[in-house]
Amino acid sequence: MKINPTTSGSGVSTLEKKNMGRIVQIIGPVLDVAFPAGKMPNIYNALVVKGRDTVGQPINVTCEVQQLLGNNRVRAVAMSSTDGLTRGMEVIDTGAPLSVPVGGATLGRIFNVLGEPVDNLGAVDTRTTSPIHRSAPAFIQLDTKLSIFETGIKVVDLLAPYRRGGKIGLFGGAGVGKTVLIMELINNIAKAHGGVSVFGGVGERTREGNDLYMEMKESGVINKENIAESKVALVYGQMNEPPGARMRVGLTALTMAEYFRDVNEQDVLLFIDNIFRFVQAGSEVSALLGRMPSAVGYQPTLSTEMGSLQERITSTKEGSITSIQAVYVPADDLTDPAPATTFAHLDATTVLSRGLAAKGIYPAVDPLDSTSTMLQPRIVGEEHYETAQRVKQTLQRYKELQDIIAILGLDELSEEDRLTVARARKIERFLSQPFFVAEVFTGSPGKYVGLAETIRGFQLILSGELDSLPEQAFYLVGNIDEATAKAMNLEMENNLKK
């Protein structure tokens, strides 16, 4: 059911008329609050604690009701630090779930989980707000069209293409390039598609959040002169926040994206970095609420929590939300319950490989582990499908031969296998690409490669037309013409050395 956003906003002035309770217990970020008989707040209602701490500093903490304990008590999780709270403090029931600002006023701004601006650029128009908890669109409202979303990144567009209005997961351990890939996608999509994006920073590094903001201002995604012309809204609940904020910040970002889809009827991009931190925060809250842990210590409600978020990220007849989610894989174990639960919801998976990153091949996307439901001849066409399959077959054969090469050496292979290995090594290097957002680190200008150019390049390598070129000519270039030009430059350099 579609819920129309409220235009009232839960202002402080209206709080005084609500139910009043008192704190009876504080355990870290969890509060137990006693209310008068018959005046219990509902589950997910926002509670506000206002007062002064022992030093006289004002306190304003918002909590969310999670459990009704009996004996007129509720258990709530705080969305900010509980420092300075004491037993007996007054708690106000707002009578509604957390609501956040939505619409054009959010563009170019940074918000916290409560929808409060944290970028020191003044207040935001809060006349139009929307509750962060709502049901997913009904089946009859969903759109089922299938079309490809071009990213300009060769390995993605060829081997695991993204669906417009789909859900994409970037899987990888620590330090293999998930955040850089997300930043490149934001950059390419803002330039090539001109769409509106919402970025949800869930439990990641504050430094990365700041870097992303500065990067967006430099690239023009956020318009410094006229903020309203910006193309992105940012919502952060970073590593230093309590688990309640990290658990709900994804819903805040999603609520803003839903408004652009349902009311403005736009195609929206929702970036979540990192969806694992959403699960991790849920696990922390679950333990604090006293629930019995499930497999590997995760919360027993893992699938339900993930489903309630993911099912709202969808395309309706009004507009679409294409979601790109970074998924941290603990200890590089894809069978861990958190990444395994996420897999079930995705249309495409981009798996980042530590082995490729160690070889210096960036983006370190594993061409054999990455998958997409879109890679079918009826969707992408015969030419694209055939090229992708032949690339995968060549790389798979190279993988099978690696043990033999390690033991016996290249010379022991048949002529055909040696040719396969040579082409596979060229393909592996041609799958690398210089990024716009990494220019400052590498000094190489970024490249956007169209799908047609990508297919043409790999067809030329597979056909054997470029067998004479050295493999380093294919490393960190854009299209195939740049590779041939680089080969000529390398040849000239070698001749000069002689």
Curated annotation (Swiss-Prot):
One of its GO terms (cellular component) is chloroplast thylakoid membrane. Disulfide bonds: none annotated. It is found in: Plastid, Chloroplast thylakoid membrane. Its EC number is 7.1.2.2. It holds the Pfam family ATP-synt_VA_C. GO terms for biological process: proton motive force-driven mitochondrial ATP synthesis. It catalyses: ATP + H2O + 4 H(+)(in) = ADP + phosphate + 5 H(+)(out). The keyword Thylakoid applies. ATP binds at G172, G173, A174, G175, V176, G177, K178, T179. Keywords: ATP synthesis, ATP-binding, CF(1), Chloroplast, Hydrogen ion transport, Ion transport, Membrane, Nucleotide-binding, Plastid, Thylakoid, Translocase, Transport. Produces ATP from ADP in the presence of a proton gradient across the membrane. The catalytic sites are hosted primarily by the beta subunits. Belongs to the ATPase alpha/beta chains family. F-type ATPases have 2 components, CF(1) - the catalytic core - and CF(0) - the membrane proton channel. CF(1) has five subunits: alpha(3), beta(3), gamma(1), delta(1), epsilon(1). CF(0) has four main subunits: a(1), b(1), b'(1) and c(9-12). NCBIfam families: atpD (TIGR01039). This is ATP synthase subunit beta, chloroplastic. It comes from Coffea arabica.
